[in-house]
A protein has these predicted regions:
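Intrinsically disordered or highly flexible coil/loop and linker segments, enriched in small
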Residues: 41, 45-52, 119, 131, ...
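Charged/polar, solvent-exposed surface patches and flexible loops
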Residues: 17, 34-41, 108, 123, ...
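Short terminal or interdomain "cap/linker" segment that borders an active site or interface and mediates
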Residues: 132-204, 216-248
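Composition- and surface-driven signal marking solvent-exposed, interaction-prone regions
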Residues: 206-213
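Active-site helix-to-loop segments that bind/position phosphate- or nucleotide-bearing substrates
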Residues: 1-98, 102, 214-241, 247-248
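Conserved active-site and cofactor/substrate-binding residues in soluble primary-metabolism enzymes
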Residues: 30, 34, 112, 116, ...
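Generic recognition of cysteine residues
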Residues: 58, 108-110, 188
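Conserved mixed alpha/beta catalytic, RNA-binding, or beta-rich assembly cores of soluble enzyme
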Residues: 72-138
Length: 248
């Protein structure tokens, strides 16, 4: 297992953009910034992945849907990205104190930080191995949920765990299979809706998939989300099933 500390942050301009994206007012910026600073006090963003020699080919992961035979011949790397346990503890503290606005702001800010973490992790892989990340395949999206088991088994770490419903702890964690390429023009910046590369075939496919949706950025109060966001917010069938079982 290889572990890399990720160096991520949000500038004030990026925070202002996020503030607008999540439908806050300019007057909310001071509180939004204070929550961001609180998160960054103890956040420990890290990326974990199998060694290059242990990298799986796509066909070794159980595939469905959009994973084609041609893509199955490309090299890939199992990856876990996490912000650590502090954001979970902070949100719990906010909730216990009835600070629901701060808790919701923390959720929004952590989404932005995870998008940054994807980008930084992709860059670290390129620096270390000379391979660029072409596409990210997520269990429960492009891969079946059961692919989570092989990703975790290949990496062999204990900081992030999953339960029988494949819900991750710490919650601000994501597991995926990074498909690699040597071609610079095929490199993926991150989740499609945050990427400026409008010519990217991955983005065009994503836009076609969601072309009937009005907004690219999610309303996390209940709207169905594109899969990259579902993984961050854990909105998958397994998590829903777990909640239903607890309520019965």
């Amino acid at each position: 297992m290889n572990k890399i500390q990720l160096h991520i942050s949000l500038s004030k301009e990026e925070l202002k953009t996020a503030l607008s994206r999540y439908h806050y007012e300019d007057a909310d910026f001071l509180l939004f910034f204070q929550v961001y600073e609180k998160i960054m006090e103890q956040a420990a963003p890290a990326g974990m992945y199998a060694s290059a020699a242990g990298g799986m080919r796509c066909q070794d992961a159980v595939k469905k849907g959009s994973v084609t035979a041609e893509e199955g011949e490309e090299r890939s790397l199992p990856v876990i990205v996490s912000l650590g346990s502090w954001p979970d503890r902070l949100q719990e503290e906010y909730a216990l104190r009835g600070m629901l606005t701060e808790s919701f702001m923390a959720e929004c800010i952590c989404l932005e930080l995870l998008l940054k973490a994807y980008e930084d992790m992709n860059g670290k892989i390129r620096e270390k191995y000379g391979w660029r990340v072409k596409k990210m395949l997520f269990p429960g999206g492009e891969l079946p949920l059961e692919a989570m088991e092989k990703i975790f088994g290949s990496i062999g770490q204990e900081e992030v765990r999953y339960n029988r419903y494949y819900v991750l702890t710490p919650k601000k964690s994501v597991a995926y299979q990074a498909v690699l390429t040597r071609k610079e023009g095929e490199a993926c910046a991150g989740i499609c809706v945050s990427c400026p590369r409008t010519d990217c075939p991955n983005r065009r496919a994503e836009e076609e998939k969601y072309r009937r949706r009005d907004a690219l950025w999610p309303d996390i109060s209940g709207m169905a989300l594109p899969y990259g966001y579902q993984r961050i917010f854990h909105r998958n069938a397994a998590a829903q099933e777990e909640r239903r079982e607890k309520n019965e």
